[in-house]
């Protein structure tokens, strides 16, 4: 059998073309993921800078001002410092669990960002069960914290890990019941559909007004899930040194630091999506019909406006969370568990029953 040179060249060119298609396909899959990671990183840096500036203002002192203009690069400088510090492993601890714990905490939170809609056409994964996927993934993070506490072979770390697991379980259930109420109101578990269901009457269509009890419970549960004051018992400095982070140093300690702010940003975004109308403009149609038409703009301009509105609402909630941290004292462990099991759980369950009753009556 004789194969001519031209035929061999055609076969090679076809093979090369198919390989290029696969490479381009992989690249186009990675572009939105890397863009989202870059945006999340910038968002975390902004939150760290905001927290330092707001806390400095509340305490009447000067915040960061030397690293970059207005101290904007201070968080980047701190991250670089942690990156080059020595990574110390506990001699009598379980090094595998000790090393895996921070990674589980960060990855579980990062995966949850995939179902966040920043605009009507800007979402990484529009799933029918998007909101419950977030609940399922976020429940993995406490496992990483418990592994970190156990793997450290330190009594303070282990107690901090146990506290983190108990706190997460206590407040995950009221949070899930509030999300279920929103899903019933919107007749969908997709984050896109939930935002679209709030888009008819400006801010009067927000779930904040239809679910005020659920909003308050969700707000408190979100702060508890983020382990922010007054719910920072897993890492209470006066009692447990630094909780499950006691034995960590270098980049692994930095991962826990990043995970806490990632969780805060994620919770703020879900408050915006579930209760504050997402990317929709807040002006009611009866007041300014021409502004209400912004919701219908497509393309790059519409996407940019949607991102700006979403982030504006998100950082409003972030400001409330940061101000709360520097205003309220820490709860005791028994008070924290009583609040979750004896108050928030019955209230969220009653809210769900009321929502279900109204939905059945409206059929």
Curated annotation (Swiss-Prot):
GO MF term list: NADH dehydrogenase activity; oxidoreductase activity, acting on NAD(P)H, quinone or similar compound as acceptor; quinone binding
Any one Gene Ontology BP term: photosynthesis, light reaction
Record's keyword annotation contains Thylakoid: yes
Catalytic activity of the protein: a plastoquinone + NADH + (n+1) H(+)(in) = a plastoquinol + NAD(+) + n H(+)(out); a plastoquinone + NADPH + (n+1) H(+)(in) = a plastoquinol + NADP(+) + n H(+)(out)
UniProt keyword terms in alphabetical order: Chloroplast, Membrane, NAD, NADP, Plastid, Plastoquinone, Quinone, Thylakoid, Translocase, Transmembrane, Transmembrane helix
EC number annotated for this UniProt entry: 7.1.1.-
Any matching Pfam family: NADHdh
Location relative to the cell: Plastid, Chloroplast thylakoid membrane
Entries under InterPro entries matching the protein: NADH_UbQ_OxRdtase_su1/FPO, NADH_UbQ_OxRdtase_su1_CS
PROSITE patterns: COMPLEX1_ND1_1, COMPLEX1_ND1_2
Class of enzymatic activity (EC top level): translocase
Transmembrane segments: 30-50, 98-118, 129-149, 248-268, 300-320, 343-363
Known function: NDH shuttles electrons from NAD(P)H:plastoquinone, via FMN and iron-sulfur (Fe-S) centers, to quinones in the photosynthetic chain and possibly in a chloroplast respiratory chain. The immediate electron acceptor for the enzyme in this species is believed to be plastoquinone. Couples the redox reaction to proton translocation, and thus conserves the redox energy in a proton gradient.
Family the entry assigns: Belongs to the complex I subunit 1 family.
Protein name according to UniProt: NAD(P)H-quinone oxidoreductase subunit 1, chloroplastic
Organism: Gossypium barbadense
